[in-house]
Amino acid sequence: MKRQLILEDGSVFVGKGFGSDREMSGEVVFNTGMTGYQEMLSDPSYCGQIVTLTYPLIGNYGINRDDFESMNPAIHGLIVKEACDIPSNWRSEESLDSLLKAKQIPGLSGIDTRKLTRLIRMHGTLKGQLCPLDVDVEQIVQELKATPTPTDQVSRVSTRDPYHVPGPGKRVVLVDYGMKHNILQELIRRNCEVFVVPYHTSAEEVLRLGPDGVLLSNGPGNPEDVSEGVEMIRNLLGKVPLFGICLGHQLFALACGAKTEKLRFGHRGSNHPVRERSTGLIEITAQNHGYTVTEGSLVNTDLIVTHEAVNDGTIEGLAHKVHPAFSVQYHPEASPGPEDSNVLFDRFIKLMESNKHRALTV
């Protein structure tokens, strides 16, 4: 079955369709990871996006029940050079094509993904639509140009109701802006008691749970659209230790008076080098974001930059000068990706311990 990708600049890529036969539109982005496609396509941060994978062969080890980052993928499409029809791995339970059909996600294979990636790098992120060949291309282009960027992605992927995960250790409130499952697992591995709450939870509701710390999760979209999160974080500063990841990092920055801006084509992949400014040490990190904190906006804030991207110098980590709070733009939980930054969860545990000790001695 032939299928095409139409971009808002008029570019057309014709290839073979797989997965669902739905017509879907969204922001077309690219991911440079070589493995981890199951975790990637189930990452809620990709809500509403059509994802191009730059590695040429995808699907060769199949899909299993353990590697999902959410059970209901929110991506609007998947584009690959070649989709493997016959996966081979002892953990495999179904093919990529089978999963996409079940989750109603359209796929496109057999196109020049390198050309598409170069196009996005040159012109910036573009809106696109996956559709059959018998459509009016010019009409689709005009519709894409006229379609506003959604502002409700976080509400689509955040938990509807709070829930509790018992544990003998530190009590953590995990604010779900589109949380990856492995963030919760990292807290559970450290024996934390976790309360997962929706994105619109107020600071008063958080404090009522008596947390030792608050973790602000990853999520999709423009951080400026999540005003509830900014207000909540602002009202929590100084009252409880904070740790922000990805979107949570951006919301933390906004709450402290900084600004964010959209990147030309974003950072998406499991091979992004990050430098810690104080030591010069390099970590290879998993990343998935289209926005960044503007360094010039930090001048009149109490924030300092702790980490920066090696490739383009953008901010990858922040810490508060006064309060026990820090954040990173990348994903220390990996999944998929390297575990160089996994120690940040241990740092969060130590921050909660030291803050509690300080409170007892005051």
UniProtKB/Swiss-Prot annotation:
GO molecular function: ATP binding; carbamoyl-phosphate synthase (glutamine-hydrolyzing) activity; glutaminase activity
UniProt KW Disulfide bond keyword: no
Sites where the protein binds L-glutamine: S45, G219, G221, L247, Q250, N288, G290, Y291
Region (CPSase): 1-168
Biological processes, Gene Ontology terms: 'de novo' pyrimidine nucleobase biosynthetic process; 'de novo' UMP biosynthetic process; glutamine metabolic process; L-arginine biosynthetic process
ATP-binding is among the record's keywords: yes
Enzyme class: ligase
InterPro entries: Anth_synth/Amidotransfase, CarbamoylP_synth_ssu, CarbamoylP_synth_ssu_N, CarbP_synth_ssu_N_sf, Class_I_gatase-like, CPSase_GATase1, GATASE
Matching PROSITE patterns: GATASE_TYPE_1
Positions of the Glutamine amidotransferase type-1 domain: 171-358
A Pfam family hit: GATase
Catalytic residue list: C246, H331, E333
Annotated catalysed reactions: hydrogencarbonate + L-glutamine + 2 ATP + H2O = carbamoyl phosphate + L-glutamate + 2 ADP + phosphate + 2 H(+)
Listed pathway(s): Pyrimidine metabolism; UMP biosynthesis via de novo pathway; (S)-dihydroorotate from bicarbonate: step 1/3
UniProtKB keywords: ATP-binding, Glutamine amidotransferase, Ligase, Nucleotide-binding, Pyrimidine biosynthesis
SUPFAM superfamilies, per the entry: Carbamoyl phosphate synthetase, small subunit N-terminal domain, Class I glutamine amidotransferase-like
Listed EC numbers: 6.3.5.5
Family: Belongs to the CarA family.
Assembly, per entry: Composed of two chains; the small (or glutamine) chain promotes the hydrolysis of glutamine to ammonia, which is used by the large (or ammonia) chain to synthesize carbamoyl phosphate. Tetramer of heterodimers (alpha,beta)4.
Function: Small subunit of the glutamine-dependent carbamoyl phosphate synthetase (CPSase). CPSase catalyzes the formation of carbamoyl phosphate from the ammonia moiety of glutamine, carbonate, and phosphate donated by ATP, constituting the first step of the biosynthetic pathway leading to pyrimidine nucleotides. The small subunit (glutamine amidotransferase) binds and cleaves glutamine to supply the large subunit with the substrate ammonia.
HAMAP family named among the record's database cross-references: CPSase_S_chain
Official protein name in the record: Carbamoyl phosphate synthase pyrimidine-specific small chain
